[in-house]
Curated annotation (Swiss-Prot):
The protein, known as: Methionine import ATP-binding protein MetN
Gene: metN
Subcellular location: Cell membrane
GO-annotated molecular function: ABC-type D-methionine transporter activity; ATP binding; ATP hydrolysis activity
Topology within the bilayer: Peripheral membrane protein
Database matches in PROSITE patterns: ABC_TRANSPORTER_1, ABC_TRANSPORTER_2, METN
Annotated Gene3D superfamilies: 3.30.70.260, P-loop containing nucleotide triphosphate hydrolases
Origin species: Streptococcus pneumoniae (strain ATCC BAA-255 / R6)
Length: 353
């Protein structure tokens, strides 16, 4: 059974500016298991970057308790000496939107800089840097300067540098937001690969639910300093409860964009009185059921599929359909009940039930 490697309990972060008090994080509790890829999602100002900085005490909380790898590092106050905190921080790597590479140093020199106080010999450092650059796919770019690298390559150097001290945790704070979509996918694939190869726990800070959908297994949603929803990616995408979470997921799945086009179709604009426009959401075993065929077989209800999407989230198929159901009123009622009994979420978008 996995254990919690990061435990943030009842965290508050308050800033005092002149006569104003700003609460950036309010009473947030998050436990992250070892080996998780854990996404923290929210719009700008939600408090997600402030929250993640308390993990290594770059930001000290105003209240709460922080436990990292079974060591309490904060409980109302910092519980470690300066030297203990320095060593603990070596277990936590960080990458950011801006790569923060030293322009006058080569890729290998940038990575080696993180090993300055490692106690390794010159030969050991050189071997480790070579291994790290190979791990992130830059073995042939060791002697290149940042100006000779693309944005994605610069971020790979930053990742190699963050891994130099063999951390157990890697925090990614909007690390792909300055990259193009193709490069973003490559960096996310690299993070996923590192998670699997090294057993690395990855904490992703992002404002894009698509990124969470691509590689995370758990997600927390923040709004105005509060944690408003948390769970597995499968749970959250299958059944988002909060309006903000629903907005994020609609954007990530493309359903909002699809609905604009669907609503302009003649079959929808002039929906007949014996028809319903419905949205179906299903996950896991229910994706294997020939449900729409069964509706006609048992209820003589026809199904016209206008939109369909199926994705694999954390190893589980999750699907969404927009369908026009047509049939007699009693048959439509029976069909809706059968759909729900099959474990499929149904929402009537248009038509009289």
């Amino acid at each position: 059974m996995s254990r919690d490697i990061i435990k943030l309990d009842q965290i508050d972060v308050t800033f005092h500016q002149k006569k104003r008090t700003i609460t950036a994080v309010k009473d947030v509790t998050i436990h992250i298991q070892e080996g998780d890829i854990y996404g923290i999602v929210g719009y700008s100002g939600a408090g997600k970057s402030t929250l993640v900085r308390v993990i290594n005490l770059l930001q000290k909380p105003s209240a709460g308790k922080i436990t990292i790898d079974d060591d309490v590092i904060f409980d109302g106050k910092v519980t470690l000496t300066a030297e203990q905190l320095r060593r603990k921080r070596q277990d936590i790597g960080m990458i950011f939107q801006h790569f923060n590479l030293m322009s006058q140093k080569t890729a290998e020199e940038n990575v080696a800089f993180a090993l300055k106080h490692s106690g390794l010999s010159k030969e050991e450092k050189k071997a480790k840097v070579a291994k790290l650059l190979d791990l992130v796919g830059l073995a042939d770019r060791a002697e290149n300067y940042p100006s000779q690298l693309s944005g994605g390559q610069k971020q790979r150097v930053a990742i190699a540098r963050a891994l130099a001290n063999d951390p157990k945790i890697l925090i990614s704070d909007e690390s792909t937001s300055a990259l193009d979509p193709k490069t973003t996918k490559q960096i996310l694939a690299l993070l996923q690969d590192l998670n699997q190869k090294l057993g690395l726990t990855v904490v992703l800070i992002t404002h894009e639910m698509q990124i969470v959908k691509d590689i995370a297994n758990r997600v927390a949603v923040m709004q105005d300093g509060h944690l408003i929803e948390e769970g597995s990616v499968l749970e959250i995408f299958s059944n988002p409860k909060q309006p903000l979470t629903q907005d994020f997921i609609s954007t990530a799945t493309g359903i909002d964009e699809a609905m604009v086009k669907i609503e302009k179709q003649e079959i929808v604009e002039h929906l007949s009185e014996n028809s319903l426009l419905v949205q179906l959401k299903y996950a896991g075993a229910s994706t294997d059921e020939p449900l729409l065929n069964e509706l006609y077989k048992h209820y003589q209800v026809m199904a016209n599929i206008l939109y369909g999407n199926i994705e694999i989230l954390d190893g589980t198929p999750v699907g969404e359909l927009v369908v026009v159901l047509s049939g007699e009123k009693a048959a439509l009622a029976g069909a809706q009940e059968a759909i729900r009994q099959a474990g499929v979420q149904l929402k009537v978008l248009k038509g009289v039930q």
